[in-house]
């Protein structure tokens, strides 16, 4: 019974997402929820400059380690720290440091060019609770749902640099004892 209810709910939510009824669950750094319109993002002017600076620095050839060091030495809180405290810069910062994974996830996120991407991950079963990443073609991408912070040219340039600098995690050869 619960499985049937879960499937119906999943179908309903996917249908609404495809019809551009976007559900804003996660608030990205640089954006905040609109005070009166449900499920709409507006630019957070307090943080907009930091997001633009991060994309510009990466597009101009600075690496993720350099940018993370810049953000941490200037006492900028990470997205988690900003969400929890509501401030972007803290002189007494003891927690919420930036790291390369957070930065790279931010640089890959299409929300900064005005698109909303949903259905990135799904739960395999309500019993098992394993989460798997959904292929790009099965994700729900709705263009121009909110005002962009970064222009598309800068975003595309950053994506090209990320692809060039990306590491290859595939095995170059099979290990003899693999799978035993």
Over which residues does each language-model region extend?
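Conserved catalytic breakage-reunion loop centered on the nucleophilic residue
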Residues: 1-180
